């Protein structure tokens, strides 16, 4: 059974050109735990790509950072608010060291700064994760 309010399709950005297009003509905001780049899409899908450079550490550290960023993005982007945007989330050296709650706040604030969500929504307290 289909839901009336279905979530838009999440599309992974995989090709280098997609990343370069967003970097060249999108908006960018730097936070201590991550860098977020966003660009409006033609369709109503949500594009998401992750990248972590070798500056962050060895392969284990880079993969851990990408895993944390993937979970963070999947939680934050699960509603319809972000349909029609592509995002590139870039991991930084602090991504692995930063507590998850602060990393999550960084992501929400970056979404507000690039203009994807209103600043009022980002100012609301972020619900605690249930353990």
Model-derived features: where do they sit?
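Positively charged, solvent-exposed patches that mediate nucleic-acid binding
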Residues: 1-131
């Amino acid at each position: 059974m289909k839901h009336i309010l279905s979530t838009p399709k999440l599309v992974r950005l995989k090709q280098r050109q997609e990343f370069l297009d967003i970097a060249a003509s999108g908006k960018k905001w730097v936070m201590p735990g991550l860098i977020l780049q966003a660009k409006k899409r033609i369709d109503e899908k949500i594009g998401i790509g992750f990248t972590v450079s070798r500056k962050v550490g060895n392969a284990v550290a880079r993969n851990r950072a990408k895993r944390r960023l993937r979970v963070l993005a999947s939680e934050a982007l699960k509603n319809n608010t972000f349909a029609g945007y592509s995002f590139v989330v870039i991991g930084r050296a602090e991504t692995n060291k930063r507590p998850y709650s602060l990393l999550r706040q960084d992501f929400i604030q970056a979404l507000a700064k690039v203009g994807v969500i209103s600043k009022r929504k980002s100012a609301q307290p972020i619900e605690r994760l249930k353990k």
